C-alpha cells in the first residue's frame, strides 16, 4: 500500500480542504505531448515559489513530483500541447512544467479525467518570457467532479515580452489556482483571461498577484 500523510482541514486561500497527501507516488504515465520543434526535457529549476498554494502543497510537489517537463523554445513560432489523461492507473498527478520562451510560442495544457474515481492534481507552472518573446498559455481543467485540482502559476517577463494566459476551469470538486507575474522588463505586457463554470458543490478559487517593477508595463485581467 502507498503510505500517506493526511492533512485535515488546512486552508488554501481561505478555502478549507481535506486531503490525503501521498508521500510516494508512481510515475504518471498517461501523458500526450505534441511538439513542433521545442527542446523538451525534465530539468526543471525547483526554485521556491514566491506565492503558490501554500507550504504543504509546495513541499509535496518538490518531494514527490511524478512528472516534470521543461520546454525551451527557439526564436521561431512553435506550438506545444500537453495532455494529462487521468485514468484508473493514473489518479494522482504531482507535476511541474517550466517554459522558457524565446520566440512566438503557444502552449496548451489539458487535464482530463477518463475515470469516475477521485483524482488529485497538484501542479506548478513556471514561465520565463525572455526579451521580445511572445508566449500564449492555455490551461484547461476537465477533471471529474470528485477530484481536487491545485495549480500554482508563476511568470517572469523580460523587456518587450508579452505573455497571455487563458484559464478554462470546468472540472473538479475543488479547484484552486494562484497566479503571480513578476514583470521586470520595460514594455512587457501580461494578459489573463479566465473562464469558470461550476455546478452543485464545486468550489472555484483563483488569486491574482502582479508586480510591475519598471516603467511602461501593463497587466490586464478579465475574469
Can you name each region flagged by the protein language model?
Residues 51-223:
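Conserved beta-strand/loop scaffold segments within soluble protein domains that form the structured core
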Amino acid at each position: 500500500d502507498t503510505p500517506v500523510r493526511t492533512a485535515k482541514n488546512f486552508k488554501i486561500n481561505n478555502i478549507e480542504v481535506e486531503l490525503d497527501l501521498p508521500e510516494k507516488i508512481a510515475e504518471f504515465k498517461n501523458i500526450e505531448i505534441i511538439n513542433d520543434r521545442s527542446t523538451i526535457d525534465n530539468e526543471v529549476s525547483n526554485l521556491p515559489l514566491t506565492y503558490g498554494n501554500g507550504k504543504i502543497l509546495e513541499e509535496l510537489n518538490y518531494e514527490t513530483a511524478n512528472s516534470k517537463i521543461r520546454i525551451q523554445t527557439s526564436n521561431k513560432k512553435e506550438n506545444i500541447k500537453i495532455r494529462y489523461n487521468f485514468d484508473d492507473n493514473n489518479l494522482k498527478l504531482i507535476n511541474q512544467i517550466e517554459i522558457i520562451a524565446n520566440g512566438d510560442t503557444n502552449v496548451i495544457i489539458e487535464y482530463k479525467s477518463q475515470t469516475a474515481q477521485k483524482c488529485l492534481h497538484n501542479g506548478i507552472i513556471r514561465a520565463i518570457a525572455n526579451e521580445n518573446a511572445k508566449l500564449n498559455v492555455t490551461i484547461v481543467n476537465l477533471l471529474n467532479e470528485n477530484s481536487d485540482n491545485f495549480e500554482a502559476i508563476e511568470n517572469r517577463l523580460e523587456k518587450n515580452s508579452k505573455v497571455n494566459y487563458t484559464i478554462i476551469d470546468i472540472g473538479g470538486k475543488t479547484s484552486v489556482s494562484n497566479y503571480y507575474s513578476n514583470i521586470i522588463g520595460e514594455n512587457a505586457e501580461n494578459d489573463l483571461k479566465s473562464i469558470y463554470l461550476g455546478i452543485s458543490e464545486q468550489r472555484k478559487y483563483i488569486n491574482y498577484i502582479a508586480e510591475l517593477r519598471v516603467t511602461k508595463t501593463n497587466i490586464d485581467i478579465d475574469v
